[in-house]
Amino acid sequence: MSKPIIALVCGGFTDEYAISMKSADLYLNNLSNEKYDIYKLVLDNNGWTAFDNRNEPVTINESNFTLKNNGQTLAIDAVVNTIHGTPGEDGKLQGYFDVLGVKYMGCNVLSSSLSFNKGFCNHFLEKQGILVPNSKLVYEIEDVNPQEMIDELGLPCFVKPNDAGSSLGVSKVKKMEELIPAIELAFSVGQRVLVESSVQGLELTCGVVRKNGIVTPVAVTEIQFEAEFFDYEAKYNSTTTQEITPARIDKETYNACMVLSVDIYKKLGCSGFFRADYILHEGELYLIEVNTVPGMSSASLLPQMFSYAKMPIHELLDEEIAELTNRE
């Protein structure tokens, strides 16, 4: 039997491009060339470029997402997606694959687009009984009345792009005069802006996967940092940020965080790897955001959780691919 042809897609159109490429490297190290024919497909503003497992370029037909290597046309059996942000995390790439009938790891169009839209996701989950910070969605900066917004949400508050990840374009606003510049910054990154009340407390994050067909929590990690908040620098470049797994919280709260993360995963209809971020405030877990294409670089949180939980990444990937290709 021929080996499944796996397309590892990476890159993207945002400042998360570099993180995606690092995530792809980790996946490549955990996908066996003995089990799969692996092709790395890189997307940028110029389109797709494709490489075989020797890093030699191959031709990609974007109209049907097939490859041509040594004169042979290859149909892709499964896609492993590591594109953070648009178009890999917001449903656009998933829609493209659905139209072409290409199978892919991770969330479908609806789950991806809902999860990536922070304001809509928070509203949906709040209706399901999940605690989230108070927030206002900004469609046009001309609509903002700073005094009314501060009266409703309080200070400090957070301003963030409604549709971006890795804390890009996020500001912590402490004075009313900082609000409009923060919103302008967020609009430079995303199409909509979310202004959110600040919830003070311990930052936690929890991973979720499907293991043996069962939605399973991985571990809870505690995040300690010296920055004002867990921004891009604190996540990827700081030498003082501490990511502690397992989180140093009581067992009841730890288990509650894992149960809640599984519940959110199911409510959003997610598949594949997933991470949910929280603030623990006065014994209550407030959801900050979810990640349906979580970072998988050596500096990322989910690989650390997998290591603690003794969940080998290659085994989890094998299971996901087997389900997509109907091969054991």
Give residue ranges: language-model regions.
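ATP-binding N-terminal substructure of ATP-dependent carboxylate-amine bond-forming enzymes
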Residues: M1-L110, L114-F116, F120, Y139-E148, ...
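Active-site nucleotide/adenylate-binding loops and adjacent lid/helix of ATP-dependent enzymes
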Residues: S2-C10, T14, K22, L114-G201
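ATP-dependent carboxylate activation and anion-phosphoryl transfer catalytic cores
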Residues: P4, F13, G129, D250-E328
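Hydrophobic beta-strand scaffold residues
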Residues: I38, K103-Y104, V132, C157, ...
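Short, flexible, mixed-charge acidic loops at enzyme active sites
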Residues: N53-T59, G95, F230-N237, T292
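A glycine- and small-aliphatic-rich helix-loop capping segment at beta-alpha/alpha-beta transitions
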Residues: G95-Y104, K175, I180, Y308-M311
